[in-house]
Amino acid sequence: MKEIISRHKAGEQIGICSVCSAHPLVIESALRFDLNSGNKVLIEATSNQVNQFGGYTGMKPADFRDFVYGIAQEVGFPRERLILGGDHLGPNCWQNEPADTAMEKSVELIKAYVAAGFSKIHLDASMSFADDPTPLDPMVVAKRAALLCQAAETTATDEQKRHLTYVIGTEVPVPGGEASAINAVHVTREQDAARTLQTHQAAFRALGLDEALNRVIAIVVQPGVEFDHTQIIHYQPQAAQALSAWIKETPMVYEAHSTDYQTRQAYRALVRDHYAILKVGPALTFALREAIFALAQMENELISPEQRSRVLEVIDEVMLNEPGYWKKYYRPTWSQAMVDIHFSLSDRIRYYWPHPRIRQSVEKLIANLNNVTLPLGLISQFMPVQFERLSEGVLTPTPHNLIIDKIQDVLRAYRFGCTPDVA
């Protein structure tokens, strides 16, 4: 990470896409995409996905590390080009607890991530606890972030500290996506970004963490990009000019969250304007969902009814029977909720792919289609972009390859934005 930031600060229009997903096919897609490019790949886990208690994935930080390393080994991707990051590391999971116990758990969370070898750490202590006022005083946020940084510094070995980097600040929705529709988005004011930096610098120095300040590479801000279930707010460079200018006076860059579904030109403009770390998550699993749905339509054309996976029906049954991950986010009317379940840009389906019934039905779908020849016309009908790549000879028509390539469509847009010599 330090090399990428140094090159950017030296004037090179370079950035990095942060892949925020625990889905094995998404991770495989990212690693295969840059297998021969020489680029580093940044994969991040969030505190609610992966923590010392298992998170909703059931993985602790060391488990997630081994999970990613296992995929890298299968792909042949070298570990030295793999960066592991932790996103929103702090008390997000324990906001309903008193400050003392929530911070104790947050400190242990940081220690677990650093001990497992994660080298990019987002210190996010912006949430109010059960006994806190709302909103929190910025200095309180900074002091808590400094305590988290102290935990990281005391855990990291000297070798780890060579690679250890921190991201501070937060101006993003609750991790997991917007719960309601958006009509506009507030662009961070440059004076607020400056205040974030100043309060964190003061809090770090008060704990003797002067050396750690040199490891702070980025500040999270809102450059004016967002999405909800049905709409996207696209980047408007002129609205963020003052913010973009301010960061030039620092040794840092910006980290932009919720950059999913922006255009490839917007990614290039964001990187040009010093939002050099672009986070993406739901857009990748949305592409995965599109691929699975497309393959299900092919299965309906090629496989006899009694042999089909019924994957779309299984998804509906599971999500309707177990609505915990989508109920408070989607519209209450049944017909509208079904549209959201299937097609929402926030892609709450992503929480259900590990469900045993859904996983088994996806496996059967792929097995069924592996046993037949996929007609080119059928691929053209349901996956036209992949059909073009088949015609160009850069893709072979297996179900697995079609899924991977569909996810990589998203990554191609980020590569255009993050790599100056890509046309």
Curated annotation (Swiss-Prot):
This is D-tagatose-1,6-bisphosphate aldolase subunit GatZ. Keywords: Galactitol metabolism. Signal peptide: none annotated. Component of the tagatose-1,6-bisphosphate aldolase GatYZ that is required for full activity and stability of the Y subunit. Could have a chaperone-like function for the proper and stable folding of GatY. When expressed alone, GatZ does not show any aldolase activity. Is involved in the catabolism of galactitol. Forms a complex with GatY. It comes from Salmonella gallinarum (strain 287/91 / NCTC 13346). Belongs to the GatZ/KbaZ family. GatZ subfamily. InterPro entries: Aldolase_TIM (IPR013785), GatZ/KbaZ-like (IPR012062), GatZ_KbaZ_carbometab (IPR050303), TagBP_ald_GatZ (IPR023436). GO terms for biological process: D-tagatose 6-phosphate catabolic process; galactitol metabolic process; phosphoenolpyruvate-dependent sugar phosphotransferase system. It holds the Pfam family GatZ_KbaZ-like. Pathway: Carbohydrate metabolism; D-tagatose 6-phosphate degradation; D-glyceraldehyde 3-phosphate and glycerone phosphate from D-tagatose 6-phosphate: step 2/2. One of its GO terms (cellular component) is plasma membrane. The keyword DNA repair does not apply. NCBIfam families: agaZ_gatZ, PRK15052.1.
